[in-house]
């Protein structure tokens, strides 16, 4: 009888061990399938699934001389940017020509000869996150270019660079119809600046509670991004993206005027110190904007 009990107990143990192993295998397979599905759904693309992937921007403001400008632009658009976008983590690039600069009379600018003053061209490169800019760093990428590429970059004057991370964004009414995915919109307004520490919370509240909603409620706004710096002179930046110049001209000032940058009707704009010649309105020259 004792042998029978012992045999039964041993049998139950074997059954439980086998059943437990099968259950663990099933759970493992299910988890692996889930991870695989999640990985596939996170693959970069041009649809809405990719909209959350470009969380860091490499922004360069600069000028160009007339001599050599056409050759530089051809090299930038046909060689430099396509090669850059083959690097891991690099998602899109947009090159802009500035239309206006300096902002309103209440805008204060930095008075420091060490801060470069270029503004006629603005190059924005979007990547997955700021870790991409750490290895290799942008200056190392430029140092490794062939001699022709280094000569082209040397044509830039007044070059100022900020590596920015996105603090947050709002999607505008024009985002659903926008066909260029993550790529910067055809018309932008961008400002980069510093703010006294004692005014930063109010400024942040002004953007979140007032300015971003006001811009994104307009018919032509694609998206608006509030940015903070990883490297560069400016600690803060704001990037408004519009589907067209016509829409920008119609909507930007109206939205700006009804959304004071502060709380309780107060504005911190007079406390901000902007980069030279900023903020800037600009139109995209690469990739070319399709004609309507």
Task: Annotate each language-model stretch with its function.
Residues 4-6, 18, 39-41:
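N-terminal cationic leader/targeting segments used for protein routing and processing
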Residues 1-14:
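N-terminal secretory signal peptides
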Residues 24-29:
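Hydrophobic h-region of N-terminal signal peptides that target proteins for export
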Residues 13-14, 18, 32:
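Hydrophobic alpha-helical segments, especially transmembrane helices
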Residues 19-23:
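Sec-dependent signal peptide hydrophobic core
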Residues 40-292:
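Macromolecular interaction modules
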Residues 31-42:
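Signal peptide processing junction and immediate N-terminal pro/mature segment
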């Amino acid at each position: 009888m004792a042998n029978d009990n012992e045999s039964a107990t041993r049998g139950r143990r074997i059954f439980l061990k086998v059943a437990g192993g099968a259950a663990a295998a099933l759970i493992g397979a299910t988890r692996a399938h889930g991870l695989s599905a999640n990985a596939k759904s996170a693959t970069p693309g041009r649809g809405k699934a990719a909209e959350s992937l470009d969380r860091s921007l490499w922004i360069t403001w600069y000028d160009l001389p007339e001599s050599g400008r056409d050759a530089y632009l051809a090299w930038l658009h046909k060689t430099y940017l396509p090669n850059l976008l083959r690097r891991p983590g690099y998602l899109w690039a947009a090159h802009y020509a500035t239309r206006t600069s300096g902002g309103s009379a209440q805008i204060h600018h930095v008075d420091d000869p060490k801060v470069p003053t270029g503004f006629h061209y603005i190059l924005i490169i979007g990547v997955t996150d700021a870790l991409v800019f750490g290895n290799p760093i942008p200056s190392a990428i430029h140092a490794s270019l062939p001699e022709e590429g280094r000569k082209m970059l040397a044509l830039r004057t007044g070059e100022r660079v900020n590596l920015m991370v996105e603090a947050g964004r709002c999607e505008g009414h024009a985002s659903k119809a926008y066909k260029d995915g993550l790529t910067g919109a055809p018309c932008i307004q961008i400002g980069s600046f510093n703010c006294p520490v004692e005014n930063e919370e109010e400024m942040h509240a002004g953007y979140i509670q007032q300015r971003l909603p006001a811009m994104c409620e307009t018919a032509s706004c694609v998206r608006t991004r509030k940015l903070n710096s990883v490297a560069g002179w400016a600690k803060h930046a704001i990037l408004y993206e519009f589907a067209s110049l016509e829409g920008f001209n119609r909507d930007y000032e109206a939205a700006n005027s009804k959304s004071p940058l502060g709380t309780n009707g107060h504005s911190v704009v007079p406390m901000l110190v902007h980069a030279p010649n900023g903020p800037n309105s600009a139109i995209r020259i690469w990739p070319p904007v399709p004609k309507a």
